[in-house]
Amino acid sequence: MSQHTQDNQINNNETIEIQETDTVPIETNSLQSGLTSLIPMILIFAVFYFLLLRPQEQRRKEREKLVREVKKGEEVLTNSGIYGIVTKVSENDNNIEIEIAKDVRIKAIKSSIIDITSRKKEVAATQENNKKNKKVICAKSS
């Protein structure tokens, strides 16, 4: 009898039960936590883009347009602080010639131009003339 119980114990130890399941459980908590940790990073990038990158890109485009449209006879300011009048614009090698005093000319790269001061003077003069015209019109109508 003892041998029979030993055989049953051996048979019981050798059997493996396999349970079939229809679906495998997925951990949704880890997936959700991964997405929620990305949201602050995306928000930080969006703020960084709209506050720093986009305005800088707009300023760069305005500056490129300014440099592209420089003409002979305009008064300019270079990044080294030199005021002068453009005497020659070279399209093929991206250089300009600036007269800083009578018979004193320097050669500079177009990208060294910071501002075209003669255009600002024209705009200011136009605005001043408009104000004077309004005053004259108001005085005549009174």
From Swiss-Prot:
It comes from the Bacteria. This is Sec translocon accessory complex subunit YajC. Residues 1-21 are annotated as: Disordered. Its main location: membrane. Belongs to the YajC family. It is found in: Cell inner membrane. The chain crosses the membrane at residues 33-53. Pfam families: YajC (PF02699). One of its GO terms (biological process) is protein transport. It is a single-pass membrane protein. SMART domains: YajC. The SecYEG-SecDF-YajC-YidC holo-translocon (HTL) protein secretase/insertase is a supercomplex required for protein secretion, insertion of proteins into membranes, and assembly of membrane protein complexes. While the SecYEG complex is essential for assembly of a number of proteins and complexes, the SecDF-YajC-YidC subcomplex facilitates these functions. Part of the SecDF-YidC-YajC translocase complex. The SecDF-YidC-YajC translocase forms a supercomplex with SecYEG, called the holo-translocon (HTL). InterPro entries: Preprotein_translocase_YajC (IPR003849). Keywords: Cell inner membrane, Cell membrane, Membrane, Protein transport, Translocation, Transmembrane, Transmembrane helix, Transport. The keyword Zinc-finger does not apply. The keyword Membrane applies. GO terms for cellular component: plasma membrane.
